[in-house]
Swiss-Prot record:
Protein's GO biological process: glycine decarboxylation via glycine cleavage system
GO molecular-function terms, A-Z: glycine binding; glycine dehydrogenase (decarboxylating) activity; pyridoxal phosphate binding
Name of the coding gene: gcvP
Source organism (scientific name): Shewanella baltica (strain OS155 / ATCC BAA-1091)
Family named by the database record: Belongs to the GcvP family.
Name this protein carries in UniProt: Glycine dehydrogenase (decarboxylating)
Residue positions where N6-(pyridoxal phosphate)lysine is found in the record: K709
Reactions the enzyme catalyzes: N(6)-[(R)-lipoyl]-L-lysyl-[glycine-cleavage complex H protein] + glycine + H(+) = N(6)-[(R)-S(8)-aminomethyldihydrolipoyl]-L-lysyl-[glycine-cleavage complex H protein] + CO2
Length: 962
């Protein structure tokens, strides 16, 4: 008979115990090793007393998985998912179950990281290369990115690219056609204001009347009209105007490509290629440009290179354009994109193939033809004379139509001028068309779908003008014509997955990235139709479940951060930085201080910080760090005083990017405030703050939170992410608003930073579940365990590698940096060699050469057990012994298992291997753990220089398949 209490038997803390890697016995052993009596004792040794919270969080108690699921099921049931015909960039779609089950719900795909280590990421790199090929084929242009955040932010990136590359250097006007989606215009205006661009909005034909550097057109437009822009684009390009086009990906299956009309840049949302609406996201945007603009492209680009054996291998190309290298001179601040969703869209194209896509697109268009024919037969006037999927109607009794629509549980588009819009999609059925006739015309209309279809087949359709019907073939590569059976598709997805190392195989200890557990129970609600299938512009009274979830999550985040308000809209951490800086900018402007435009940034900052400051129209001034990695207070005081009249803010990270809690953090905040500036605290390292301290308590004014780091949203192989911002009350009126959905906040009048009002709302249930299940105590214990794991790893490795930075009591925060520069100097072994050798041991390398070149930054998170930590430590110790053999001369510098890493099956099958000074066993089975569970890299070390000098960012030529 157990003596446990009923409360103990109910196991309300079971999720907490499963989320945290080390069990109680392991924790005690680790505490003993690092020299602490308890987690509280360790916390007291590490976190400065002056910033330690005296009270616990007020989130509530932890709860069990069943209880959490029951509660969020109640929220989901409050959402009324009506049939949506709103369109405007968001459409119903059928997610193929083979993709839903094997990609979207598969940790092998959603727990991987951005493929900075391409040798162990060849699977998702191939999937993204497929996405780029789809984008290029459909748009008719030369070079595609790996994905952007959404269609509206892609439009803003297109505008920025246009300014960079246009030969009309004196022009400062960007023209936007007045029939683009309103949310796109909203985001473009927000970005243009920061850059000092003038945005002119008008009919497309009027673009020729202005001196422009760029112009934006919608194809098809918001009303459904399809326009042949060939002559207009030629006229504009003759005037050195960069022509950008927002295009509907499904319509491009049937329509003449914008590239063939003369467009320079084409972008849009890939959402309707098998990705649910999710109340606004996440969705991947495609972005394609002419080859001549490749150096000015934003975001990730996947390219083809070769490995050390000369075999074809994939990698991220032209990274010198990006924020982690070019900082404030980068083309964009993009870090996290939407790789998981781009993968889904690419698999959708692979699974359906060109014929299947044409059938789907043709069916959508046929239903639109039938709807239009029936309405016109009853004397209804249409706004548009051509269409792919959208019919816009004028002259209706809007109130009556809306009442009938709501009674039939459907949402139409109602414009302010009385126009009613209907956008059809892949999910539309015959019965839906019949219901639409009833709603628009009232009962007794006598229309018959079959008869109307027969009429269209007999007479032909003019909805797509003959000159705009696509004539060229699309998706002719074998990849898009070979996997149309589910068996083959399932195996193709599995084959790619097996090439990638993700959290479902081993720890990914990337510093500043927080690769923690993404628990299955947290992921479950994301697939529920009540969350997945809601249109972001649905009436808010139909989204009561989402509204309550967002309100509860926001309240929790306010408590966790110590701020007064939260804005959920930014759909990545970098977007959160941009949104936070905009709030600061608008705050200064409201006080008559528009001249305050200088942003102080420590030299150790993340690359997104200076890139975001530049994006917000600020001037970056770099402040020095001392030998301990802390902000140099003397330099900060000097520079803050020098720029005091124009100081806007400082951007700092806490704990610092060097992995320590700076004792002077409050003094840093005070210095900036005394000179009239605001404090932006980067939330990248929030996993070392939750429950112990907070940005608001420290003295910051605004922060973004990486929900895909601290709050358990998976990284998805490079996205999705979420970057909501927390602000003090004086900044709350200046956070992002939205032109379409206005929930009644004081910031509603502000411009948007993302296409959807709540950003990627579809993944918010993950963070809601994470916080709900852990509760106040669990959140704090997670942070404390992250500190324990990091200090355990640090102390173990310090016996073999120098640790670069430590804080009070020789402790680190949640991550540590080991210095490889002395070893490199003594042996010739580089940090790259060690990173690639870790692949042979079954590990993704820690963060390399950030924030200091020649180092590795290790962040184990709270989710890794002592067993896994010891396996990683053993690998690093073994690698140190291998380096010693190079130092001693036993192995040549240019022929050893580190220099030749990673090793593949082809290596050990090669008869030439016998000429190497080490055995096959040393190459591929360097530890006992690897012998029982081996991850095989599928390519050898990739030649980055070759890839950039011979740029190829599309699927292999057909000759490779012959």
């Amino acid at each position: 008979m157990t003596k446990q209490t009923l409360t103990q038997l109910e196991q309300h803390d079971l999720f907490l115990r499963r989320h945290i890697g080390p069990d109680s016995n392991q924790q005690q052993a680790m505490l003993n090793f690092v020299g602490a009596e308890s987690l509280e004792d360790l916390t007291a040794q590490i976190v400065p007393e002056s910033i330690r919270l005296s009270q616990d969080l007020s989130i509530g108690d932890s709860c069990g998985e069943a209880e959490g699921i029951a509660y969020i099921r109640g929220l989901a049931d409050q959402n009324q998912v009506f049939k949506s015909y709103i369109g405007m960039g968001y459409y119903g779609t059928q997610v193929p179950n083979v993709i839903l089950r094997n990609v979207f719900e598969n940790p092998g795909w959603y727990t991987a990281y951005t493929p900075y280590q391409p040798e162990i990421a060849q699977g998702r790199l191939e999937a993204i290369l497929n996405f780029q090929q789809v984008s290029m084929d459909l748009t008719g242009l030369d070079l595609a990115s790996a994905s952007l955040l959404d269609e509206a932010t892609a439009a803003a990136e297109a505008m920025a690219l246009a300014k960079r590359v246009s030969k009309a250097k004196k022009a400062n006007i960007f023209f936007v056609a007045d029939d683009v989606f309103p949310q796109t215009l909203d985001v473009v205006k927000t970005r243009a204001e920061c850059f000092g661009f003038e945005v002119v909005v008008g009919p497309a034909s009027e673009a020729v009347n202005y001196e422009l550097f760029g112009a934006l057109f919608q194809y098809t437009n918001r009303f459904g009209q399809i326009t042949d822009f060939t002559e207009l684009f030629a006229t504009l390009r003759a005037k050195n105007v960069i022509v950008t086009v927002a295009a509907d990906i499904m319509s491009l299956v049937l329509l003449k490509s914008p590239g063939s009309m003369g467009a320079d840049v084409v972008f849009g949302s890939a959402q309707r290629f098998g990705v649910p609406m999710g109340f606004g996201g996440p969705h991947a945007a495609f972005f394609v440009a002419r080859d001549e603009h490749k150096r000015s492209m934003p975001g990730r680009i996947i390219g083809v290179s070769k490995d050390a054996r000369g075999n074809r291998a994939l990698r991220m190309a032209m990274q010198t354009r990006e924020q982690h290298i070019r900082r404030e001179k980068a083309n964009s601040n993009i870090c996290t994109a939407q790789i998981l969703l781009a993968n889904m869209a690419s698999f959708y194209a692979v699974f359906h193939g060109p014929d299947g896509l044409k059938t789907i697109a043709s069916r959508i268009n046929r239903f639109a033809d039938i709807l239009a024919a029936g309405l016109q037969a009853k004397g209804v006037s249409l706004v548009n004379s051509t269409w792919f999927d959208t019919i816009s109607i004028k002259g209706l009794d809007v109130a009556a139509v809306n009442a009938r629509a709501l009674a039939a549980e459907m949402n139409l588009r109602f414009d302010a001028d009385g126009t009613v819009g209907v956008s059809l999609d892949e999910t539309t059925l015959r019965t839906d068309i019949e219901a639409l006739f009833d709603v628009i015309l009232g009962a007794g209309h006598g229309l018959d779908v079959a008869a109307l279809d027969a009429q269209i087949v007999s007479q032909g359709s003019q909805s797509i003008p003959a000159a705009l019907v696509r004539q060229d073939a699309i998706l002719s590569h074998p990849t898009f014509n070979r996997y149309q059976s589910e068996t083959e598709m399932m195996r193709y997805i599995k084959r790619l997955e097996s090439k990638d190392l993700a959290l479902n195989y081993s720890m990914i200890s990337l510093g500043s990235c927080t690769m923690k557990l993404n628990a299955a129970v947290e992921m479950l609600p994301v697939s529920w139709p009540e969350f997945a299938n809601m249109h972001p512009f649905s009436p808010l009274d139909q989204a009561k479940g989402y509204t309550q979830l967002i309100e509860e999550l926001s309240t929790w985040l306010v408590n966790i951060t110590g701020y007064d308000a939260v804005c959920i809209q930014p759909n990545s951490g970098a977007q959160g930085e941009y949104a936070g800086l905009l709030a600061i900018k608008k705050y200064h402007e409201s006080r008559g201080d528009a001249h305050r435009n200088i942003c102080l940034i420590p030299q150790s900052a993340h690359g997104t910080n200076p890139a975001s400051a530049q994006l917000a129209g600020m001037q970056v001034v770099v402040t020095a760090c001392d030998k301990q990695g802390n902000v140099d207070l003397d330099d900060l005081k000097t520079k803050a005083a020098e720029v005091a009249g124009n100081l806007s803010c400082i951007m700092i990270t806490y704990p610092s990017t060097h992995g320590v809690y700076e004792e002077s953090i409050r003094e840093i905040c005070d210095i900036v405030h005394q000179h009239g500036g605001q404090v932006y605290l980067d939330g990248a390292n929030m996993n070392a703050q939750v429950g112990l301290t907070s940005p608001g308590f420290i003295g910051a004014d605004v922060s973004h939170l990486n929900l895909h780091k601290t709050f358990a949203i998976p990284h998805g192989g490079g996205g999705p992410g979420m970057g909501p911002i927390g602000v003090k009350s004086h900044l709350a009126p200046f956070v992002a608003g939205h032109v379409v959905v206005k929930p009644g906040r004081e910031s509603d009048h502000n411009g948007a930073v993302s296409a959807a009002p709540y950003g990627s709302a579809g993944i918010l249930p993950i963070s809601w579940m994470y916080i709900k299940l852990l509760g106040s105590n669990g959140l704090k214990k997670s942070t404390q365990t992250a500190l324990l794991n990091a200090n355990y790893v640090m102390k173990k490795l310090s016996e073999h590698y120098p640790v670069l930075f430590r804080g009070r009591n020789d402790r680190v925060a949640h991550e540590c940096i080991i210095d490889l520069r002395p070893l490199k100097e003594a042996s010739g072994v580089t940090e790259m060699d060690i990173a690639k050798r870790l692949n042979d041991y079954g590990f993704h390398a820690p963060t390399m050469s950030f924030p200091v070149a020649g180092t590795l930054m290790i962040e184990p998170t709270e989710s890794e057990s002592k067993v896994e930590l010891d396996r990683f430590i053993d690998a690093m110790v073994s690698i140190r012994a291998e380096i010693a053999k190079v130092e001693s001369g036993e192995w040549p510098v240019d022929n050893n298992p580190l220099h030749n890493a990673p090793h593949t099956m082809a290596d050990i099958m090669d008869p030439e291997f016998d000429t190497r000074p080490y055995s096959r066993e040393v190459a591929v089975f360097p530890s006992a753990a690897v012998r029982t569970n081996k991850f095989w890299p599928t390519v050898n070390r990739i030649d980055d220089v070759y890839g950039d000098r011979n740029l190829m960012c599309s699927c292999a030529p057909l000759s490779d398949y012959e």
